[in-house]
Amino acid sequence: MTETCSGDGPNVITDVVTMPATSADTEVLPGIHTRLERRGLRPEQHLVDGGYTCLVHLEQAERDHQITVVGPLPGNPTHQNRQGEGFARDDFRIDFDRQEVTCPQGQVGKGWHGPYPTSSLTAAPLIVARFTKSQGQPCPVRAKGTTCRDGARNVGFPPRELHELQLRTRAERREPDWHKRYAVRSGIEGTICEFAHGHGMRRCRYRGQAKAHLQHVLTAIAVNVERLSRHPPGERRAPTTADSLPGLPRPARHPALASWRAAS
């Protein structure tokens, strides 16, 4: 689900998606942006967790919708980066104009291949530069550059536009201002808790994805009505709670309502 987080009024849920449990979060991001723009609700920034971020969709959001997606990108998967030692991919100098990759020791790769398409719709195309065993074997710091016994190494990276976006996004994440801005995203966890524990959203009341989605949409509408009636625009709002009807006295003999359906 997607909600506003401007801080100057009640947070309003603007989009709800119902997907199979086996689907990945990255699959839904383009559809969310398309629906928000169609409704006239396009945000300048969209704060998401790491499950939604991939280079392809970050670039697509900027290009097609002028939306800046703010969220942590997956880390570099190379062995050197995971271990925190040796020469990771970002230690290599990439020259897109000359189609050359230079290692930290000054060796220029012998090949530039691709970009190759990947099997995943959310994965960026991959360019591969190869360093041969004749370059790696005599290197005095070979252990830092490759784990291959013969000294060869392949260095993979996305095309220029995506590579520059990747570097810029990772650099911004190291800035204190980025963390301050991104901290606002944690508020959606309170909304998820409100849906799950206050409205029984962990359990579908109907069979079929279409009916389940209708349940989710109607519940979101009910939550919006409750929030807007409790905190009209312009008034400061209280933190999101998981209670169905917060603020009302509830004697011990009257248990909390499990969902909006129970109140009908």
Each model region followed by its residue ranges:
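Anion-binding and metal-coordination hotspots
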Residues: 1-264
